[in-house]
């Protein structure tokens, strides 16, 4: 992976692009209380929304996709990489300006502590670095 490919855009541009995104609400959710606003694709044979008639609600489509440079970016401007063991941290040492790690759910407590300590040594940002860590009991 070359760093010029993943040059992070300024956060202002990212937030500006995400501000433009359209909220799609379900057809007739404003008309009936029983119809919740979360998007469902219309399937009716005479549905004006499904037929894409003029003046009706827009349906989600490929034209609303985000630009490639900012797709999958987190609010801090980094991309997320899942980490399963300590060896997954080594590629992130040179790319820690562009990527941050997220420890996978299946990783146990012993490995999780080792990953967190190694990430601190290497200066890698972890999204869930303090999640599910068992504090050591002093005797």
Curated annotation (Swiss-Prot):
BP-aspect Gene Ontology terms: translation
GO molecular function, one term: structural constituent of ribosome
Species of origin: Encephalitozoon cuniculi (strain GB-M1) (Microsporidian parasite)
Descriptive protein name: Large ribosomal subunit protein eL32
Superkingdom to which the source organism belongs: Eukaryota
Family: Belongs to the eukaryotic ribosomal protein eL32 family.
Keyword field: Ribonucleoprotein, Ribosomal protein
Record-linked SMART domains: Ribosomal_L32e
One Pfam family matching this protein: Ribosomal_L32e
SUPFAM superfamilies: Ribosomal protein L32e
PROSITE patterns to which the protein is assigned, alphabetical: RIBOSOMAL_L32E
Keyword Ribonucleoprotein: yes
One GO cellular component, as annotated: cytosolic large ribosomal subunit
């Amino acid at each position: 992976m070359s760093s010029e490919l993943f040059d992070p855009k300024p956060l202002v541009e990212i937030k500006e692009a995400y501000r433009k995104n359209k909220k799609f609400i379900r057809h007739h959710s404003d008309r009936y209380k029983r119809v919740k606003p979360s998007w469902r694709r219309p399937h009716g044979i005479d549905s004006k929304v499904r037929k894409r008639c003029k003046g009706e609600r827009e349906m989600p489509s490929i034209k609303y996709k985000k630009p490639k440079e900012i797709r999958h970016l987190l609010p801090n401007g980094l991309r997320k990489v899942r980490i399963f063991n300590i060896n997954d941290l080594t590629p992130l040492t040179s790319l820690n300006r562009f990527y941050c790690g997220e420890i996978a759910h299946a990783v146990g407590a012993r490995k999780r502590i080792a990953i967190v300590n190694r990430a601190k040594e290497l200066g890698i940002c972890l999204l869930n670095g303090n999640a599910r860590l068992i504090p050591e009991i002093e005797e």
